[in-house]
UniProtKB/Swiss-Prot annotation:
GO cellular component terms listed in the entry, alphabetical order: molybdopterin adenylyltransferase complex; molybdopterin synthase complex
Name of protein: Molybdopterin synthase sulfur carrier subunit
Subcellular location(s) per record: Cytoplasm
Job of this protein: Acts as a sulfur carrier required for molybdopterin biosynthesis. Component of the molybdopterin synthase complex that catalyzes the conversion of precursor Z into molybdopterin by mediating the incorporation of 2 sulfur atoms into precursor Z to generate a dithiolene group. In the complex, serves as sulfur donor by being thiocarboxylated (-COSH) at its C-terminus by MOCS3. After interaction with MOCS2B, the sulfur is then transferred to precursor Z to form molybdopterin.
GO biological process: auxin-activated signaling pathway; Mo-molybdopterin cofactor biosynthetic process
GO molecular function, one term: molybdopterin synthase activity
Any matching Pfam family: ThiS
Chain positions found as 1-thioglycine: G109
Keywords: Cytoplasm, Molybdenum cofactor biosynthesis, Nucleotide-binding, Phosphoprotein
Modifications the protein undergoes after translation, according to the UniProt entry: C-terminal thiocarboxylation occurs in 2 steps, it is first acyl-adenylated (-COAMP) via the hesA/moeB/thiF part of MOCS3, then thiocarboxylated (-COSH) via the rhodanese domain of MOCS3.
Amino acid sequence: MALDPKANHAAAAAASADNPTAAAAKAKVKVKVLFFARARDLTGVTEAPVEVPAGSTAGDCLARVLAAFPRLEEIRRSMVLALNEEYAPEDAAVGDGDELAIIPPISGG
């Protein structure tokens, strides 16, 4: 008995339709993280892509960024986040294609 790949694909699609939670658990969103001023100095880059599960927050993205760029811990307590050019709390939901800016403390004189 030969396996029919089309039948297997159809069965998998039906299973995903029957269980949207399982399908959502596998869904990922890509967020572009932007680094400014001291954050850029600490990372050595102006931007980096981050992929997180659908339903993630700005804080989830930040956790991934901090894991990838541990030197950012130096400014962690004073940084501000902006999601799509609007200041945002860490519990703000992120979506595919969003931009998350890490804004370090600003000083002047």
